[in-house]
Amino acid sequence: ADDMMSFIKSDIIVFGIGVFLFIVATLWFVFRKLIWIIVPISSCFFSVIIMIGILGLLGWKVTVISSNFIALMLILTMAMNIHMSTRFLQLRENYPNKNISELITLTTRKMFWPILYTVLTTVIAFLSLIFSEIKPIIDFGWMMTLGLFTSFIITFTLLPSLINFVPKENISLVKYEDSKITSYLAKISQNNNIIIFTITGFIIILSLVGISRLEVENSFINYFSKNTEIYKGMKLIDEELGGT
């Protein structure tokens, strides 16, 4: 049990830090301004904190399966925040005479339905997990569903409030020169339709063959390293008492 708790805590820390660094790098690549890294990350941070508090109040326990919900929440919330922030900056450029409050209102109106549809489709995917017969998987489905709705609410409440405090001189969209990579890929897709469809069809066939060869791993003991106490204990039970 002690090993199990250690693994869960380790996963939360490792994946949390990894996702945080990835998010910072992504935001810097997109916005190139420190303030536009701080604002979306603050929104993500509060979403996760609120969700953890809700789980605590509901008495839901984090398991090996659901231990990565924080990393998933950060990624999904960040996607919403980037859409909102980018749209706000685009509207700022298109309507320079409007004040910040008007731009925020316009942004939320334009982005509400697109982001809502995105959230609902993702929620449906996670809700499919509740039809499993394994309780930790069912709980994970409910956790992510609740987490997505929490992130959605934060994106349309806290994020606009934070944007309202951004200094005016930092409200501008970074202009990029035409990318050689995207131009090259565009030419390939326009001039090689038949080849692309042929390769895609071949890959689909290979994927179907691979799917037919998938096997389910039902040995819980193999989830852990051989030098851990939990592995040694379960191996002893497997060999001496007929299985875990």
Task: Enumerate the language-model features and the residues they cover.
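Solvent-exposed, non-transmembrane loop/terminal regulatory segments of multi-pass membrane proteins
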Residues: 186, 213-244
